[in-house]
Amino acid sequence: MQTKSERLGQAMAAISRGDVQAFGEILLSDDVVWHWPGRSSVAGEYRGRDAALELLSGFHRLTQGRLHVESLNVLEGRDHVMSFTHVTAQQDGRELDVVMADAMRFGADGRVEEFWTLSNDQEAVDSFIG
């Protein structure tokens, strides 16, 4: 059986190549709840895989495909995974360079049921997103 870390690795590879749909199919349960922090236009809760994928698709549209993610570290527990990711992005001459921490609660089917995203510089993320 595939570990949660392996599933996450496959999903991160998909998002790195811009395949948002594959990311969702690999990692997210149908009824996932994604918590996005901050004060930007996208801050809030996203309920369901379609809503979560729209959030991610919006980032790819915003950056016109210039969104890059690099996994730094993954910590796996019984039901949870914590992932630290270096994220860089560009849009309209502006750059974003942050470390994101994603906490994920996995369900019995091996997919994420709840997802929390945090940043080492939320103000920079909010400013970049708008």
Model-derived features with residue positions:
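Coil-to-beta-strand transition motifs
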Residues: 78-82, 95, 105-113
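A short, polar/proline- and glycine-enriched secondary-structure boundary/capping micro-motif
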Residues: 45, 93-95, 123-129
